[in-house]
Every structure is written in structure tokens, then in C-alpha cells.
């Protein structure tokens, strides 16, 4: 299969797309059904027998405006977040194309996939206007197929967290969240197409500050990264709360990635917060085991034709009396920096970028970049949607600075980002997902 640029490097050719097969084509609403589409009504609830439908709790209404366009003349609408799932035939990458809009009213829709991966941000349509958005969703199962030096088996998931609370990340379906935001917002979904595609994959490995957090108010830069890439590349987040480079090896998360990695794919990895605890336990340190385990990951990725990228761990929120961030992870950031230099690997210094970001906000306003599970409590390690969004921008800027191949797939509206001048926190307005928790992620 031949690949050409994402506007220069990575989009598949038309001949390659001809080999893709449409898994599903859905027409939402009670009106006439477009040829080749399956109708979805408000009462279409997901079941294993049906293989598609709304997840329980969806409060949706069907509207038919009539007209000559069966795809856009009717739709499913709601002023509350709702979820729609479709079972897919195999793990891998799928291009999802969604048609939004209403012939007679305004709509606003934010789309997230699986565990709150941000795919489309606040898509607005005026009355009579329709928008079609496309993005790539990566799906996976715990099973590991043999590939080269990788033996068959499965990822050692953490139950019940990964098997139940985070089950959408490991099941055989694509789950989409449609979120209208605050009143009087409303989402109007006209159609969805889901197509299996062969595109380059960017794998992520990391801890709770990287992984797809399933519940508000917690969020990570990994689940925001999808927002900043065109549909010529997939983001596959294999991070998990409470983990280390050693856990990545022991729980076979790296093996899972290597079993599906193709030449030219990328692995971006960031650990450190939990690795640091090995010092007190007497089981490791930054310039010994941590660096050695980074090397194990880099060597394995290169054996499989991948591109490794090392990211230093962002700082915690802890200010000194002068309003400067205290360096709580300096040794691990330096060890990551040394490993990247010695291994001649791309390096994103998120530790260095996080400090001016927090300091630009200051001791008080920086609280608004971190999760606040209760009115009087701030989690100074884990971020909220705003903090995760800004750190994702730091990572994207690092991808640009390293001139990585996937930089050509960065969305056009990104421009550049300087953590010294973050987006105004008061202007950030990403709709929150409906599920929340007061329990911190593992490894807090």
C-alpha cells in the first residue's frame, strides 16, 4: 500500500482507499432512508444482537424536516450529551464521517470517541447549514497476536478499572459521544459512516497524565491530542493510570503495541510520576533502571520499524514563595533527556514546558488547570480539560520542533503554541462529559 503526504506526506492514495470497506452507514431520523443506509430511530438501543444503537440513558428525539435529501432532511437531536455505538469487525483504525445540522435551526456539537477522546470541537451550523466532519478512531482488544519476537497472549488489564469503568477502550465497538454543551445548545446528527482504513498510527504510552481518563473532572493530554490531527493518522492511547516503564513491559502493553505496529508508525511515551516511587521502595532510580527501561522501549520500537519519541514528565503543581514551580521531577526529566540524547531519539521536554505554563497562570489561577473533584480540593498532579488541552498543545509543538513525519498531519488551525502565553483559562469552554467521579486516578 502506497502512502503519500497528509497534504504532503501521509494520506493514502485513492487506489489505497479503494481497498477500504465501509463497515456501517447510518441514516439518523424518522424520515425517508437514504439508499444504502441503515435507519437509526430514537428507540434504537444498542444490543449485541443488533450491533449498533444508542447507549442506555440517551434522551434523544427524531425530527423529519422533509425535502428531497433523505440524508439531511431528518436527524436525531438532543440538548444533552448522548452516546452511540457500533460494533466493528476487527480492531484497528476506522475513519468516522459524521453529518451534522438542521434545515431549520442552529446546532452545536462536540464529538468525543471511546473514553472522551476529543475528535471534533464545538462544530456550529446555522439554520439550513450542514457540516461533515471526519476523524480516525483506533479500536483495540486485549489479545496479542504473534508478530516477530512477540509471543501470543493478552494485555494484563487492571480489573475492574479497565474491564468495567474503562471497558469502552477495549471492546469490539466504536462509541461516540455527541455533546451540545450548555443550554441552549443542541446536537443534530444526520448520518454516520464508519470505514476501516489503513493509516499510520501514533501510539501513546504513559501514566494517568497521558491515558484516556474515563470520568470528569480528570483529563490527560493524550485524550486531547486527537483534536490536533487530520484524519490521515490515528492516535492509539495505550497509557494507563498508576503505571511505569516497568509496568508497560510487565503488563505487556508494549508487546500489544509492537504486535500491531507497522513500519513508520510512532510511539510517544511519557512516564516518571510513578517510576519515582521506586526510589523509596528500593527498586529503581532515574539514572539506573528508568533509563535502562527507556532504552528497552526504544530498542524494541526500532526493531519493529517504528519511530520512538521520549517525553519528559510534566511537573506537579507546587509553587515556592516566589511564585515559581518547585522541581519535583527534575531527576526523571534529566534522565529522559539523557536517554534521548544517548539513543539519538526525538525528545519533547514537557517538563520544561509545563513549568512556565503553570507560572504564567500563577499560584491561584493554575488551580483551574488541575482536576478539582470537590469544591475545596485540588489534585496537584492530574489535570482537568483545560490543563490537558494546553499540555496537548505543548506536545504538538514538540512534534513540530522535532520535525517528525506526523507533523504534516497537524490541523491547519493549530498554528503554534508558547506555554508562556497559554490560552486564557476564562475563555476555555470544552463541554464536559456526563460521567464524573471524586476518586483520583491510580498512582495519585
Model-derived segments and spans:
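N-terminal secretory signal peptides that target proteins for export/translocation
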Residues: 1-2
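Bacterial N-terminal signal peptides
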Residues: 5-15
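Compositionally biased, intrinsically disordered or flexible polar/acidic segments
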Residues: 19-215
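Conserved beta-strand scaffold positions in the cores of enzyme catalytic domains, especially
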Residues: 25, 235-237, 344-347
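Short, flexible loop segments at the rims of nucleotide/cofactor-binding pockets, characterized by
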Residues: 74-75, 243-248, 324-326
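Short, structured coil segments at secondary-structure junctions
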Residues: 113-114, 231, 304, 343
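Conserved SGNH/GDSL esterase-like catalytic core that processes O-acyl groups on lipids
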Residues: 170, 179-187, 195-204, 209-300, ...
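Alpha-helical cap/lid subdomain in secreted, periplasmic
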Residues: 252-412, 420, 431-444
Amino acid at each position: 500500500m502506497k502512502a503519500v503526504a497528509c497534504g504532503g506526506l501521509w494520506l493514502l492514495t485513492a487506489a489505497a482507499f479503494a481497498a477500504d470497506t465501509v463497515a456501517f452507514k447510518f441514516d439518523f431520523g424518522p424520515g425517508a432512508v437514504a439508499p444504502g443506509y441503515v435507519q437509526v430511530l430514537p428507540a434504537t438501543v444498542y444490543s449485541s444482537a443488533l450491533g449498533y444503537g444508542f447507549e442506555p440513558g440517551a434522551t434523544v428525539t427524531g425530527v423529519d424536516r422533509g425535502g428531497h435529501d433523505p440524508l439531511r432532511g431528518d436527524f436525531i437531536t438532543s440538548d444533552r450529551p448522548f452516546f452511540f455505538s457500533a460494533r466493528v469487525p476487527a480492531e484497528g483504525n476506522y475513519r468516522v464521517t459524521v453529518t451534522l445540522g438542521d434545515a431549520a435551526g442552529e446546532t452545536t456539537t462536540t464529538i468525543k470517541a471511546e473514553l472522551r477522546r476529543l475528535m471534533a470541537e464545538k462544530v456550529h451550523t446555522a439554520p439550513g447549514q450542514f457540516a461533515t466532519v471526519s476523524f480516525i478512531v483506533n479500536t483495540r482488544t486485549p489479545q496479542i497476536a504473534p508478530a516477530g519476537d512477540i509471543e501470543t497472549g493478552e494485555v494484563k488489564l487492571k480489573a475492574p478499572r479497565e474491564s468495567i469503568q474503562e471497558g469502552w477502550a477495549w471492546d469490539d465497538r466504536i462509541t461516540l459521544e455527541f455533546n451540545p454543551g450548555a443550554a441552549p445548545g443542541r446536537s443534530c446528527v444526520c448520518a454516520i459512516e464508519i470505514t476501516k482504513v489503513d493509516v499510520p498510527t501514533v501510539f501513546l504510552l504513559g501514566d494517568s497524565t497521558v491515558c484516556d481518563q474515563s470520568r470528569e473532572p480528570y483529563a490527560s493530554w493524550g485524550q486531547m491530542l486527537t483534536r490536533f490531527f487530520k484524519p490521515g493518522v490515528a492516535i492509539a492511547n495505550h497509557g494507563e493510570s498508576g503505571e511505569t516503564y516497568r509496568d508497560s513491559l510487565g503488563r505487556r502493553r508494549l508487546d500489544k503495541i509492537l504486535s500491531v505496529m507497522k513500519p513508520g508508525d510512532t510511539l510517544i511515551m511519557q512516564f516518571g510520576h510513578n517510576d519515582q516511587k521506586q526510589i523509596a521502595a528500593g527498586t529503581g532510580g532515574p539514572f539506573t533502571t528508568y533509563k535502562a527501561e527507556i532504552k528497552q522501549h526504544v530498542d524494541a520500537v526500532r526493531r519493529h520499524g517504528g519511530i520512538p519519541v521520549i517525553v519528559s514528565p510534566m511537573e506537579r503543581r507546587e509553587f515556592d514563595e516566589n511564585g515559581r514551580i518547585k522541581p519535583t521531577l527534575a531527576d526523571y526529566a534529566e534522565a529522559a533527556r539523557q536517554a534521548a540524547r544517548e539513543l539519538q531519539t526525538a525528545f519533547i521536554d514537557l517538563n520544561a514546558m509545563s513549568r512556565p505554563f503553570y507560572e504564567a497562570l500563577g499560584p491561584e489561577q493554575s488551580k483551574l488547570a488541575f482536576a478539582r473533584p470537590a469544591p475545596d480540593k485540588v489534585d496537584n498532579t492530574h489535570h482537568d480539560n483545560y490543563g490537558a488541552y494546553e499540555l496537548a498543545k505543548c506536545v504538538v509543538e514538540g512534534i513540530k520542533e522535532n520535525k517528525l513525519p506526523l507533523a504534516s498531519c497537524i490541523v491547519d488551525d493549530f498554528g503554534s503554541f508558547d506555554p508562556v502565553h497559554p490560552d486564557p483559562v476564562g475563555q476555555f469552554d470544552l463541554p464536559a462529559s456526563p460521567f464524573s467521579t471524586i476518586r483520583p486516578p491510580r498512582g495519585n
